[in-house]
């Protein structure tokens, strides 16, 4: 992404995951599906990094958190919508051999539509073009945008007097020394917390509810209802993201998750579980928005933005490969499902302390100021 540009990267990874999803939908057996799932994960994992990190270059520092949160708000409606589709498919009696294939085809078609819109409408990041020494191309894009603004407002924009500065190209090794090393560590920890907590709840909630005596339809319904906390939480985050310092925001959200995790684990009735799961999801997805859409993507210089954000996301994903084994062990122990919620709380506390001690402040700073690591 740092080499070929933001727009080309988005389209490349869209194509990869679209092909993989269509291939998965028509897979003749589980082994072919494994292969397509692997390719799909590669495409989607890379796409998330490019989308969120690249977007920070298109908006000003004073309200970057709000706009990034709005992006996340729209995107995270996918979770309750997908669970709603799954619930409908299960209850309508579509065969097991077809229901998951339908789940694959729906987002693949939507992704094709999104790719066409991106190809036609999204300009390349002027900041990335400038970092590559392609100043004339960057100027042409911004000039076009300025003319559109002047035409819509009827007012001329002030002239630009600042000359373009030479952008220092940073090697990949720069992530592991000097000021960037601290950001690499903090970003990795922030996303380890996000992945382990978010995916534990998403992946294990139906199984946890089933272990508590609820049937498949009941657990699917409760999970779907709880996941409406996702867009609600991100909507709240979009309203306050640029009003609270980034470090403080992270610590508050992690503390809320720790408390709500313990409370949720103590509930025994369906109504109480739905309410507490909704509140827990609200806090979790406020943190997801904070971590994946705002804080980690914005803490890097332009020439290392996708490298840094990509590395931290990779570490977060790797932790999520191994964490389910710990969850399985805890769930099988004496505390059962309650132990899983306690585990979520412990992870939240540990990450919160790390952000409080080592976190860097980026709220309101321009991309250029954040990128000054000399």
Model features per residue range: what roles?
Residues 1-374:
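Transmembrane-helix signature of 12-pass secondary carriers
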